[in-house]
């Protein structure tokens, strides 16, 4: 009888021990999983580009005042605050356009509102870094703001034809566009960065953009790289003669935002993400904070 009681006690002990061991194993497994679902930015610029506004060549005074305004919002922190609304947790502000009326003193801005976060629409309202700057510039000049939304290819042309005063459309400075407009001083330095899962070591030894590009060139057609739709990252992955990007073997997957792309990467649906450096840092910090 005593032996049976001892055997029962031993069985209970073993049962409790195995249950505890299993629980510890599961917790350890969860911890390991969490380590692999964070995101890291490879701190190497894949591209370098400068954004500026394109002013009517026949309005040198507007060019001068716009350059003064750019210097002002850079120095007093206004530009940084605007950017934070779109790259961090700030609240973007709606910008409204007046109706074009040649009898009024208006600032007529040409844009292509399909380039979030620089310019985009929700309903009849405009949003984006460029659009908020446009509103402040119009206020600074004491003018009423009119926004003319058009195809991207027509933006600089409309200014050269004096249908609009200034082009504000995430414009990279280049010689071809300088035939149509006079560029202001740069207000935004853009570069593309690569985001990878934190357990990926493929790029650990990379020191330059060429090093990263060489690794990306080894991707397969079955691999997928996420980008925010319409951005330089998309051209980098797909290839573009205008941008002198050869393209990558991997398939380009577009998303409405960089956040959606990074989350899809962490879910295992794509391999990497390529987006602008500033949003790359903000997005990974925000997503990793809740992992």
Predicted features and spans:
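Immediate post-signal peptide segment of exported/extracytoplasmic ligand-binding proteins
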Residues: 34-38, 89-126, 209-224
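C-terminal motif of bacterial Sec signal peptides marking the signal peptidase cleavage site
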Residues: 25-29
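Extended ligand-binding regions for polar small-molecule ligands
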Residues: 45-91, 131-140, 197-214, 219-220, ...
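A ligand-binding cleft/hinge motif common to bilobed small-molecule-binding domains
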Residues: 34-47, 154-157, 170-180, 235-239, ...
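Periplasmic-binding protein-like
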Residues: 37-63, 102, 113, 188-196, ...
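Ligand-binding cleft/hinge of the Venus flytrap
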Residues: 121, 134-143, 213-221, 228-254, ...
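Extracytoplasmic small-molecule ligand-binding "clamshell" domains
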Residues: 51, 61-89, 101-171, 254
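Acidic, polar ligand-binding/catalytic clefts
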Residues: 37-47, 135, 144-214
